[in-house]
C-alpha cells in the first residue's frame, strides 16, 4: 500500500492522505529516539512521571479534536471516542502515579551476597497498532514505556493516519521530549528494516494473526523481544443460574460496542439450556433497536464499520457460515446508506464443520451456542485456536470462578463483558498472542532485569 489514507466510512470519501516516510525520515527518527534513550538512562523516572501527568491533562484538553478525528477515520460513535480519550488519560495518570514505585529495585534473598535486580530501559521500541481503538492502542504501549525510558516509534494502521499524527502532536506539545513518540508511515518493507535496525530493541504489535505472525518472525530473526496482542474468538458463557437482569445488562452492548470491532468482545455466546431462548430474544431486542446513522450524531447507535473492505469481509464470512448450515435467527433490516454499514446478525446452529467455527468475526455478529452443563460450556469455550478474553455469567461467584479458571484464555470477566484499565493486565494465549500490556506486567515487557550482587564478603 503506497499511502496512508483517511476515508470517512460513513460517506466512503477520502478526506486526507499521507505519503510513506522516506528512508532518511526513518533514519532520522531512529537516531532521535535512540539519542533520547541514551539521555533518559541518566535521568530519574520521577521527571517522566510529572511529564506523563501533563500528557494526561493534554489528552483531556484535546478530547474534542481527538474524538472527532477517530470517529471520522474509523467510524466509531463519537461518545465512544470520547470515552476512549478519558480511558487513555486515566492510563497515563495510572503510570504517572505508580510507575516510579514499580521500577524500584527488587531485593533477592541469597546466601551468596547482597543481591537485587534493577529494572532498566532497553531502548527504542517499534509499536505497530490497529485502527479499532486509534488512541488507546497507542497509549497502552506508550505510557508504561515512557516511564521506563523506552522511546516509541509508531506505525499505525493505514486508515487512521490522522489520529496517529494528532496523538503524537498533542503528546509533544504537552512537554514530552522530542523523540518520545515518533509517528511514521512506513511500508511493510521499511517496517522490516526498522525492526532489524540494532538501535531498535523491541516490537509491540496489536493486530491480526497474519500481521502478528509476520512481525514476530521479523523480530525473532533479529533476536528482538516482542509482545503480540492478536485476535480473539472469545466465549461468553451463560450458566443456568445467571441473574436475568445481569444477563440483560451485560448483553446490552457486548456485541455492539465499537460496532463489535473489539478483539476481546465475546463473539461466541455459549448458553446453558434454560437461558437459551432468553439470550436469543435479548440479543434480538438489542440489535433491532439500534439506530443506524452518522456516528457524529448523538442519536446514532449503529455506526458504519471501519471500512467498506471490512464490511465486505464480514458479509462473506456470514454468507459462508449460512451456506455451511448456520441459521440466521435475526438480521437487521436493509440500511439505505452509501456508508460501510453491516447489518447486525444472530447466528445459530454452527457446528464444528462450519468454516467460521474457529474464525474471528470482527463486527456485530452474535454466534449463539446451546450446551447442557458447565463441562460442555468449558469444552466448547476451549475448542478454539484463540484465547484472549471471556465472560462468565452466574449468580454463584465461586462457581463462576471455577469455570473461569478452566478456560484457556488470558482474561475472564465475571458478570460483565470485556473491560480494560491501567491496572489490569491485557493479553492472551494460543493464537491470540503472548506477553502482556498494562498493569505492572505490561510495564516490564521491555525492561532489562539487571542483576547486581555484592559478594565482597566472600573474597576478603
Question: Whereabouts are the PLM-identified features?
Answer:
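N-terminal Rossmann-like NAD(P)+-binding subdomain of aldehyde/semialdehyde dehydrogenases
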Residues: 1-113
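Residue-level signal for inorganic ion chemistry
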Residues: 12, 48, 70, 92, ...
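ALDH superfamily catalytic-core signature
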Residues: 15, 210-351, 414
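Short, well-ordered beta-strand elements within core beta-sheets of diverse protein domains
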Residues: 16-21, 35-42, 127, 236-239, ...
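Structural signal for hydrophobic packing residues in well-ordered secondary-structure cores
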Residues: 37, 41, 56-63, 67, ...
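Rossmann-like NAD(P) dinucleotide-binding subdomain of oxidoreductase/dehydrogenase enzymes
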Residues: 104-246, 371
Amino acid at each position: 500500500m503506497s499511502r496512508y489514507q483517511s476515508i470517512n466510512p460513513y460517506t466512503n470519501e477520502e478526506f486526507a492522505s499521507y505519503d510513506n516516510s522516506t528512508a532518511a525520515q526513518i533514519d532520522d527518527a531512529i537516531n532521535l529516539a535512540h539519542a533520547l534513550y541514551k539521555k533518559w538512562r541518566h535521568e530519574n523516572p520521577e521527571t517522566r512521571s510529572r511529564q506523563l501527568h501533563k500528557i494526561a491533562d493534554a489528552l483531556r484538553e484535546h478530547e474534542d479534536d481527538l474524538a472527532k478525528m477517530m470517529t471520522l477515520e474509523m467510524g466509531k460513535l463519537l461518545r465512544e471516542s470520547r470515552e476512549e480519550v478519558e480511558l487513555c488519560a486515566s492510563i497515563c495518570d495510572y503510570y504517572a502515579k505508580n510507575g516510579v514505585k514499580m521500577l524500584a529495585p527488587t531485593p533477592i534473598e541469597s546466601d551468596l551476597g547482597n543481591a537485587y535486580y534493577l529494572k532498566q530501559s532497553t531502548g527504542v521500541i517499534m509499536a505497530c497498532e490497529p485502527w479499532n481503538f486509534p488512541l488507546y492502542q497507542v497509549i497502552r504501549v506508550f505510557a508504561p514505556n515512557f516511564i521506563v525510558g523506552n522511546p516509541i516509534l509508531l506505525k499505525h494502521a493505514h486508515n487512521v493516519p490522522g489520529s496517529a499524527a494528532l496523538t503524537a502532536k498533542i503528546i509533544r506539545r504537552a512537554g514530552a521530549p522530542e523523540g518520545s513518540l515518533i509517528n511514521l508511515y512506513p511500508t511493510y518493507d521499511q517496517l522490516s528494516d526498522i525492526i532489524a535496525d540494532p538501535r531498535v530493541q523491541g516490537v509491540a504489535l496489536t493486530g491480526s494473526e497474519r500481521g502478528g505472525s509476520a512481525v514476530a518472525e521479523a523480530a525473532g530473526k533479529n533476536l528482538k523481544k516482542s509482545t503480540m496482542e492478536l485476535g480473539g474468538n472469545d466465549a461468553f458463557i451463560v450458566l443456568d443460574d445467571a441473574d436475568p437482569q445481569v444477563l440483560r445488562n451485560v448483553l446490552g452492548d457486548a456485541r455492539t460496542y465499537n460496532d463489535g470491532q473489539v478483539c476481546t468482545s465475546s463473539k461466541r455466546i455459549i448458553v446453558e439450556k434454560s437461558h437459551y431462548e432468553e439470550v436469543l430474544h435479548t440479543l434480538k431486542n438489542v440489535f433491532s433497536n439500534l439506530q443506524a446513522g452518522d456516528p457524529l450524531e448523538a442519536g446514532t447507535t449503529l455506526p458504519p464499520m471501519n471500512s467498506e473492505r471490512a464490511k465486505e469481509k464480514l458479509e462473506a464470512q456470514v454468507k459462508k457460515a449460512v451456506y455451511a448450515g448456520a441459521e440466521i435467527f435475526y438480521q437487521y433490516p436493509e440500511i439505505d446508506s452509501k456508508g460501510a454499514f453491516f447489518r447486525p446478525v444472530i447466528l445459530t446452529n454452527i457446528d464444528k464443520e462450519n468454516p467460521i467455527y474457529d474464525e474471528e468475526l470482527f463486527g456485530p455478529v452474535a454466534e449463539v451456542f446451546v450446551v447442557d452443563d458447565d463441562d460442555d460450556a468449558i469444552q466448547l469455550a476451549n475448542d478454539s485456536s484463540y484465547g484472549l478474553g471471556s465472560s462468565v455469567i452466574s449468580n454463584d461467584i465461586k462457581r463462576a470462578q471455577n469455570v473461569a479458571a478452566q478456560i484457556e484464555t488470558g482474561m475472564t470477566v465475571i458478570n460483565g463483558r470485556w473491560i480494560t484499565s491501567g491496572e489490569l493486565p491485557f493479553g492472551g494465549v494460543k493464537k491470540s498472542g503472548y506477553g502482556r500490556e498494562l498493569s505492572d506486567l505490561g510495564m516490564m515487557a521491555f525492561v532489562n532485569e539487571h542483576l547486581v550482587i555484592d559478594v565482597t564478603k566472600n573474597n576478603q
